[in-house]
Amino acid sequence: MRECISIHVGQAGAQMGNACWELYCLEHGIQPDGQMPSDKTIGGGDDSFNTFFCETGAGKHVPRAVFVDLEPTVIDEIRTGVYRQLFHPEQLITGKEDAANNYARGHYTIGKEIVDIVLDRIRKLADNCAGLQGFLIFHSFGGGTGSGFTSLLMERLSVDYGKKSKLEFAIYPAPQVATAVVEPYNSILTTHTTLEHSDCAFMVDNEAIYDICRRNLDIERPTYTNLNRLIGQIVSSITASLRFDGALNVDLTEFQTNLVPYPRIHFPLVTYAPVISAEKAYHEQLSVSEITNACFEPANQMVKCDPRHGKYMACCLLYRGDVVPKDVNAAIATIKTKRSIQFVDWCPTGFKVGINYQPPTAVPGGDLAKVSRAVCMLSNTTAIAEAWARLDHKFDLMYAKRAFVHWYVGEGMEEGEFTEAREDLAALEKDYEEVGVDSADAEGEEEGEEY
């Protein structure tokens, strides 16, 4: 069995977790108390969901997940919410005091008090697995717990489970909608610390998701619940291949093999289609080629950047629902003829396809229409460097004046860590730039230097 353990850190992580587990339960027919009505199990023979749930002797299905936050309010909502019986009480771990949007508190002072409890709980979950495949880590870049504690935990996981994959789902601070002034600091510190510990990181930009909710779902003022449900669908699409049997199955390590050309270039851009409200879906024919084309529209991306300015290094299309390979091949052939989509010259093929016959599930009372097919595209493009450039610029503006730095130093950090992290991100931007240069151009430049 190839089990995955989900770790939800901080408020953003926990709220994404709520949306994801709600959706998983609906998809697998598991009730909020963890029971699975027996009509599903008889002769179904499909037990792939065991990658995400473990079954107790009493027939209860418990998520292989841990929720951690340094302050209790958000996780208390889970303890009293609809799904309170689903989780083992020890899987919901809370501290007493907040990380206060401060990376240093999450990583050094307060985080280190709780990290051993968390690792102990993860160890118990891991011992329960026959063949642990890896970890999915949900967090935000901007918060203190999401940035500081996540990076601490990732370092420790690398020590304890060296060879296991670690995939991140990270909320990137939105250009317009910021929840904290110090988000650029936290983001850059956490990216620097986790860069070598994470195998693949799917970034989600709140603003991009706001816009999708406004534009495609006609929600005037999207709430976090709207955002998280949409993120839930995306995470579900990415993990569907681990939880259902499909025609072309994709597992965690397979993503990395196909999406990550160099260890540091591991930030794929996620696009999901169709995001459509029930009123509209009624009147639209969403064919395979239409939803495939929609994936190449910048408007459907989860991070604001323009792939038309960058080059694709790899591209993974994960279809679910009523999809046959013939349609997919036709759709991809059409895409390849378009000139706006450029691949780097050292990666000519570039499309990997996964097909899963389980159609997407709509959450009752949710915003997304029930559709018969959907696609999630993971693409590694050099354009995502724009996102880093934006963040670095904001960091520079504040750091030039050393604004807010004393809060971090007061918690035991040194200013040198800021400079080191910033240099690492400058190197990351440079890496992206170099990857996008055509090999022919690069050779020309080198020759030019000799004379």
From Swiss-Prot:
The active site is at E254. Its EC number is 3.6.5.-. The lineage of its organism: Eukaryota, Metazoa, Ecdysozoa, Arthropoda, Crustacea. It comes from Homarus americanus. GO terms for biological process: microtubule-based process. It catalyses: GTP + H2O = GDP + phosphate + H(+). The modification N6-acetyllysine is found at K40. The keyword Repeat does not apply. Its cofactor is Mg(2+). GTP binds at Q11, E71, S140, G144, T145, T179, N206, N228. This is Tubulin alpha-3 chain. The record marks Y451 as: Involved in polymerization. Undergoes a tyrosination/detyrosination cycle, the cyclic removal and re-addition of a C-terminal tyrosine residue by the enzymes tubulin tyrosine carboxypeptidase (TTCP) and tubulin tyrosine ligase (TTL), respectively. Dimer of alpha and beta chains. A typical microtubule is a hollow water-filled tube with an outer diameter of 25 nm and an inner diameter of 15 nM. Alpha-beta heterodimers associate head-to-tail to form protofilaments running lengthwise along the microtubule wall with the beta-tubulin subunit facing the microtubule plus end conferring a structural polarity. Microtubules usually have 13 protofilaments but different protofilament numbers can be found in some organisms and specialized cells. Belongs to the tubulin family. The keyword Calcium does not apply. CDD domains: alpha_tubulin. SMART domains: Tubulin, Tubulin_C. It is found in: Cytoplasm, Cytoskeleton. GO terms for cellular component: cytoplasm; microtubule. Tubulin is the major constituent of microtubules, a cylinder consisting of laterally associated linear protofilaments composed of alpha- and beta-tubulin heterodimers. Microtubules grow by the addition of GTP-tubulin dimers to the microtubule end, where a stabilizing cap forms. Below the cap, tubulin dimers are in GDP-bound state, owing to GTPase activity of alpha-tubulin. Keywords: Acetylation, Cytoplasm, Cytoskeleton, GTP-binding, Hydrolase, Magnesium, Metal-binding, Microtubule, Nucleotide-binding.
